[in-house]
Regions:
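A glycine-rich, hydrophobic loop/mini-helix early in the fold
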Residues: 38-45
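Extended, low-polarity transmembrane helix blocks
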Residues: 1-35, 47-66, 70, 77-138
Length: 138
């Protein structure tokens, strides 16, 4: 049963991250988008990191987006699952800490940040492999 739980968590976390990335690149319809384009996302990133210079906040936004793309594909495929799940949890926790320090604790709950961190940590703890490249590559 745990292999199905892990598979579900991998799918849930990876598709959520890919959806957020798709939103940043305007791949979702405008009426359902949060940001709609990368410029809006970078402005949002700047609001979460007001103590950073704009150029550094923008770099952070791009780096986070790149990491989310890589991590979500790895989780989806089950490649280096334990490591990538821990890294994903750390990345999302950084997002949560930035939200907490800039807009408050409630926003982290509204965006289910800590649920996502918990899901990532759970993935990293579940050792049984199911539909993972890791089970083929040793």
């Amino acid at each position: 049963m745990t292999k199905y739980i892990k598979l579900f968590l991998r799918l849930a976390v990876s598709t959520a991250m890919l959806s957020a990335v798709a939103d940043r690149f305007g791949l979702w319809a405008a009426k359902i988008s949060v940001w709609g384009n990368m410029d809006n996302f970078l402005q949002y990133t700047q609001s979460l990191l007001p103590y950073f210079p704009t150029s550094l906040a923008n770099a952070g936004g791009w780096i986070a987006t790149l990491l989310e793309m890589v991590f979500s594909v790895c989780l989806l495929l089950g490649f280096k699952t334990e490591l990538v799940a821990k890294l994903s949890g750390a990345l999302i926790a950084c997002f949560g800490l930035a939200m907490f320090t800039s807009v408050g604790l409630k926003a982290t709950f509204d965006y289910s940040v800590w649920n996502a961190v918990g899901a990532c940590l759970a993935i990293s703890c579940l050792k049984e492999k199911h539909w993972e490249i890791d089970s083929v590559i040793k």
